[in-house]
Amino acid sequence: MEAIIGVIGTILGTILGWVLNSVSNHGKLYLYVSSWDDNFLYNEVGCLVPCISKEKAEYYSYKLTLDIYNSSSEARIMRDITIIYSDDKCELHKSVPKDDTTRYSSGSISFYNDIAPVNIPPKAIIQLKLHDGSHHQNNGLDYIWKTRKIYLTYKNEKSKTTKIAIKSEDYSCYFENHK
């Protein structure tokens, strides 16, 4: 009889351990947009200055700061991080952001690498600082005037795509709203 109780105890202990392990591994990534700053610039005699009209805009740039918390007991990954500009119906433009931590210089010019896959340790918070931009040449800014929503997308360790809203604004009225 004691042998049967011992076997049942072992089986129940194994099942309980498996359940507790599964529960502790069942977590997810929480993304918080700490800051989003975008601006339009134009070239005034060799110097980039803030723009006040759609017609003068030559450059568009953004800076994004993300706080990412992994609530799981296992490391999580973010791959193929992309910024999506949308008009509520379809994607207008995709941008792979540059990672501020990869800055390197050549002379007086700074360069940055595209964001690489990011591993987030278990029960940890990391901060990402990203940026990118567009130039008006070859209709490079046409998409922005049709934009109504901006998203960040990434793929997780199971290649599932997740979409996070960053900003909702009608960019056709950008300069009227930002005087």
Give residue spans per PLM region.
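Membrane-aqueous junction of the first/signal-anchor transmembrane helix
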Residues: 1-166, 170-179
